[in-house]
Amino acid sequence: MAATAVEFQRAQSLLSTDRNASIDILHAIVKRDVQDDDEEAVRVKEQSILELGGLLAKTGQAAELGGLLKYVRPFLNSISKAKAARLVRSLLDMFLDMEAATGQEVELCLECIEWAKSEKRTFLRQALEARLVSLYFDTKRYQEALQLGSQLLQELKKMDDKALLVELQLLESKTYHALSNLPKARAALTSARTTANAIYCPPKLQAALDMQSGIIHAAEEKDWKTAYSYFYEAFEGYDSIDSPRAITALKYMLLCKIMLNSPEDVQSLISGKLALRYAGRQTEALKCVAQASKNRSLADFEKALTEYKAELRDDPIISTHLTKLYDNLLEQNLIRVIEPFSRVQIEHISELIKLSKGDVERKLSQMILDQKFHGILDQGEGVLIVFDEPPVDKTYEASLETIQNMSKVVDSLYNKAKKLT
């Protein structure tokens, strides 16, 4: 069996020069039957399976990797349950993390869960179900994610697998946030952080918790300073393990600076030592938005959104907050434009801020309803008539003050009468 170990070493040595040859050698080792009592052969085969899985994932061979996951099932009885669970999870993670989606992800995951059930491997089944919840979330099947997640949470709370419980509670928080149910998203995140405090959290999981904390603070409380701190922690965590999620955390840090009206900090962040290695279109997109925000330029803002559509619009977190920022910028521009006028043509306003007449009309209507300024739209004439700010009626405040003073007088008289008796 020493020959198998030599073959494995040869496959590893060919990784950098001839991947196909390396894959062929590993395929041969994996297909070879081994005796259960031959520990060395079993160990080499286990390593070969993982190495082959990694190579198939890197070369985008999704179908072959899915086939490998099914093919190795008989071999899993030759190794301990813990090793078998690690092997299945590793191969499934490789398959699900591949960018070349096959559409078979959910089906393969369900197959693995059924196999784990038939083999009575409870811990593996729970881990695979948690991965399926994550998959449902990624594919926007939120109700299915919540349904399966809820069942699994009840089960895990009775057991001692706190790491998996944290992962699931975090997924629950993300799902509720995606459904815009912020109170439940916050409650699930609080549960996840409480559970995480009782165990050692791997850097990846801790970074994910920090990331979600930042997202919730930004979404619910608009507390951008606290959100920035969490995103920074998440960025450092992801950066320490070379995770591709680090660039997302960096983008959210830049977004916080823009929302805090500190667009000048964006450039210093991008050119900082830690973030320099992530320079590219992702950071350039936020840099353009920061510049547009600094100049209060709607045209530059729209240009950035068009030019960097994938980087800005495809991320729901960034897209949501940039939409709000754009609305605020539009309102500020409109108020600045109409300030000198008591009566102005809508056509003239649209020319000044370089937007279509329909868009300007809709926004002005909304601002009037929200009482951002006082006026009416005369659509027949195509003009906006702006009124002076009506004087604030202070009768209510004066009445409250009078009642307050009378209350003090009555209390004082009561205390004096009490002393006399």
UniProtKB/Swiss-Prot annotation:
Recorded superkingdom: Eukaryota
GO biological process assignments: proteasome assembly; stem cell differentiation; ubiquitin-dependent protein catabolic process
Annotated ranges, domain PCI: 227-391
UniProt cross-references to Gene3D superfamilies, sorted A to Z: 1.25.40.570
Phosphoprotein in keyword set: no
Pfam families per record: PCI, RPN6_C_helix, RPN6_N
Alphabetized UniProt keyword annotations: Cytoplasm, Nucleus, Proteasome
Molecular functions per Gene Ontology: structural molecule activity
Subcellular location: Nucleus; Cytoplasm, Cytosol
Single GO cellular component term: cytosol
Sequence similarity: Belongs to the proteasome subunit S9 family.
Subunit structure comment from the entry: Component of the lid subcomplex of the 19S proteasome regulatory particle complex (also named PA700 complex). The 26S proteasome consists of a 20S proteasome core and two 19S regulatory subunits.
Protein name: 26S proteasome non-ATPase regulatory subunit 11A
